Amino acid sequence: NPNHTTPYWGIGHPKYVVPSATTESDMTPSRIPGYDGSASLIVPQAPSLASSSSNTSLGAIGIAISGAAIFNDQEGNGALDQAAVTLDYTGAHIGPQEYHYHLEPRAWSDDDDDLIGIISDGFFIYGRKCNATGTYPTDLDTSGGHTSTTEHTITAEYHYHIINEIYSTTASYIVFAGPYQGSPNAVN
């Protein structure tokens, strides 16, 4: 479960906030207190690039630093467009079984180089800016990845960024659509 405010905590919870990016009637019917938000992800200490990339799938594809799951740009059997109205101010909602982010988690990252979380192939994902340059990286691969230093490293290493492209009509940015550049493990 996330460590920040959201309307998905439900009225009466200390972290509940009134919806600002959606409305109560547009929100998914579930609320966080009814779910066990625990998850585990085992990744190599030093992840490596795979010989070929692989597509992300439905469900959790990573874990954010807030403790909630990261999902790709799909919702059910289609694009996120129709479900975008259910997303809270931080680009997340509940469904089918957990609170998760699809869009840049504005609870702690908004157009910056902050750590977002870890993707299930073991590579970290950061905000839209590069810590090494202080600007939007111009050398990203199709997954939003490149090799440079980060706020947590002194030597250059491969990592992902939220790609600086507005998603559809949301005025926000997808956290990670993929494909994976490493070998993914399951988030359980």
Where are these regions (language model features)?
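Solvent-exposed N-terminal domain segments of exported/luminal and surface proteins
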Residues: 1-79
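Short consensus segments that form the blades of beta-propeller domains
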Residues: 31, 91-92
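Extracellular/lumenal glycan-associated surfaces
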Residues: 39-46, 64-69, 95-108, 153-168
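Short clusters of hydrophobic/aromatic residues that line enzyme substrate/ligand-binding pockets
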Residues: 43, 90, 143
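Short loop/beta submotifs within extracellular cysteine-rich repeat domains
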Residues: 51, 70, 107-111, 125, ...
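Short helix-loop boundary/capping segments
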Residues: 78-88, 95-136
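Long, compositionally biased interface segments
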Residues: 138-188
